[in-house]
Amino acid sequence: MKFQAIVLASFLVMPYALADDQGGLKQDAAPPPPHAIEDGYRGTDDAKKMTVDFAKTMHDGASVSLRGNLISHKGEDRYVFRDKSGEINVVIPAAVFDGREVQPDQMINISGSLDKKSAPAVVRVTHLQK
């Protein structure tokens, strides 16, 4: 019985005794300064703000995400969206509004796809966030 306890205890301690201490952070060299980092995750530094003018230059079917205001209702599910760079027509089905009301002075985020087949180009909105 004592022999089994000793064998069991040695198996429990063995991984710690044989553990390799080569892993973890190696501090052999100094990290690069923040402005010199070329790769890796940098959070919002990588984010490019999309504008209406930039969205109009994209290809048909491109995914767009814009931040601005709905400034007018053109009938049924058609609206005019404006940000700091310009205006674009958008199509927002009632289901996307989901009962929410949006005022022209409220800043909103819209996401959808660019439809350049219609003239002028429109954004078919699939998500709206107040």
Swiss-Prot record:
Q: Does the keyword Signal apply?
A: yes
Q: Which SUPFAM superfamilies does the entry link to? A: Hypothetical protein YgiW
Q: Where is this region: Disordered?
A: 24-43
Signal peptide range in chain numbering: 1-19
Q: Could you tell me the keywords of this UniProt record?
A: Signal
Q: Which InterPro entries does the entry link to?
A: BOBF_sf, BOF, Ca-regulated_OB-fold, YgiW/YdeI
Q: Name one GO biological process term.
A: cellular response to hydrogen peroxide
Question: One Pfam match, by short name?
Answer: BOF
Q: What is this protein identified as?
A: Uncharacterized protein YdeI
In its UniProt entry, the species of origin is given as: Escherichia coli (strain K12)
